[in-house]
Amino acid sequence: MKPSIFYSSRQPYLKYLAIILTTITIYVLTHSSYSADPNINDVTTKPISETVPQPPPQSPSSPEQQQQQPANQDQIVKVPEELKNKPQDLVVDNNKDQKPAVSGVPKSSSSSPQQQEKQDTKKESENSSSSKDPVKPEKVKATFVTLARNSELYDLIKSIRNVEDRFNRKFNYDWVFLNDDDFTQEFKDLTTALVSGKTKYGKIPKEHWSYPDWIDLKRAEETRKNMKLQKIIYGDSESYRHMCRFESGFFWRHPLLDDYDWYWRVEPSIDIHCDLNYDLFKYMEDNNKVYGFTISIHEFRATIPTLWDTTKKFIKENPQYLAENNFMDFISDDKGETYNLCHFWSNFEIANLNFWRGEAYRKYFDYLDQTGGFFYERWGDAPIHSIAAALFLPKDKIHYFDDVGYKHSVYTQCPLNPQFRYEHKCHCNPDNDFTFRGYSCGKKYFEKMGLQKPKEWEKYQ
């Protein structure tokens, strides 16, 4: 249809429609230059990488790299840097090289995970001087030793799982189990399944778990009755006395231990609070130590009324066994006149079996045993071990493991330094640490050994 028809139309609405269409056509033609604007092509064809600013390089390793950052960096949307520099309250994952911050814990001074691992402990670096893998040093002749009944199995496997997770999965040391009865197959199967090293099971000879011929059984019974009336812990127990005598004088004689020089005693229902990334056995051997402990405590005086007098008689008759530079001042406050009851808690001890096998200790135990004090009183293996170590060893042969984090019964040893607890994944509460409490002998040990107390100790005494 020709345009003239619209203009000549007699119908008014067609005339108006023609005017509108003409106006639109003129406007489009006069503004056609918009479609040729080069900016529109830039916007529609520019790749995303040019329109969105790239993040700055992560953690530049040199000043030159830092200077190459864009000048308008303050206008760029920041992205998180790599995990080692992430915000301290951000937890990304459980990788040991990507540690979240803990409130109150200072930043580590190490510049790399490798340096952090080297600074973790002097002991770890000493054990790895000839190896690139510090957790797999050359093993020593050592084993765990546990005295347990079949009825204690499920309390014991918790201890085993704990020790394996915190320490032995890295080192695979053997485990010797002893019992005054035959072990059940279930006991053997479960413990073998949990232990990463070899497991060995032994029955205690009857003569090591019974009354010697020289004991007056009636007198021993009267002692148990009297102690029960006095409400002395384990005062009426026969089995407890047999256990203390066995741990004092016979466990180290068992044939299953003949192949070993070192042992670590583990009991049911204990807890290891911290990761142990070095070989504690090898540390003892390399540093010429003999006896190691975690908790020191006072003994109940009513259980050992004549133990010290008997010990003094032995020393008087055998002065040659008293070591130079011994640790007498830890167990006596008056140069040996009386016993102050301090001892190392023997439910955790790492020690050299050859010390117990030696002449001095053998004669000392036999001397004590002949008096009947295990049955006429209630002598414990802990004070006997401790007195022997304090008298027959130079004090520098005794070692306090301040880094284990150990709990048995109601008493806990927990490292006091927050950074250490963080780095070693300790799950203990330092408020429960027993080391510097009143009933502990921790303060005396530090003072008499000439050691500097942790800077946090006053807060937890």
UniProtKB/Swiss-Prot annotation:
UniProt feature, compositional bias: Polar residues: 35-52
Start-end of Basic and acidic residues biased regions: 117-126
Topological category with respect to the lipid bilayer: Single-pass type II membrane protein
Keywords of the record: Glycosyltransferase, Golgi apparatus, Membrane, Signal-anchor, Transferase, Transmembrane, Transmembrane helix
GO cellular component: Golgi apparatus; Golgi membrane
Ranges that cross the membrane: 13-35
Family matches, as SUPFAM superfamilies: Nucleotide-diphospho-sugar transferases
GO molecular function, one term: alpha-1,2-mannosyltransferase activity
Swiss-Prot/TrEMBL GO biological process terms: cell adhesion involved in multi-species biofilm formation; cell wall mannoprotein biosynthetic process; cell-cell adhesion; cell-matrix adhesion; mannoprotein biosynthetic process; protein N-linked glycosylation; protein O-linked glycosylation; symbiont-mediated perturbation of host defenses
Region span, Disordered: 35-138
InterPro entries from the UniProt entry: Glyco_trans_15, Nucleotide-diphossugar_trans
Listed EC numbers: 2.4.1.-
Domain of life: Eukaryota
Low complexity bias: start-end ranges: 61-70, 106-116
Active site per database record: E349
Stretches of the chain found on the membrane's Cytoplasmic side: 1-12
Gene3D superfamilies in the record: Spore Coat Polysaccharide Biosynthesis Protein SpsA, Chain A
Location in or out of the cell: Golgi apparatus membrane
Family note: Belongs to the glycosyltransferase 15 family.
Role of this protein: Involved in O-glycosylation of cell wall and secreted proteins. Transfers an alpha-D-mannosyl residue from GDP-mannose into lipid-linked oligosaccharide, forming an alpha-(1->2)-D-mannosyl-D-mannose linkage. Mainly responsible for the addition of the third mannose residue in an O-linked mannose pentamer. Can also substitute for MNT1 by adding the second mannose residue. Important for adherence to host surfaces and for virulence.
Protein's name according to its UniProt entry: Glycolipid 2-alpha-mannosyltransferase 2
Source species: Candida albicans (strain SC5314 / ATCC MYA-2876)
Lineage, top ranks: Eukaryota, Fungi, Dikarya, Ascomycota, Saccharomycotina
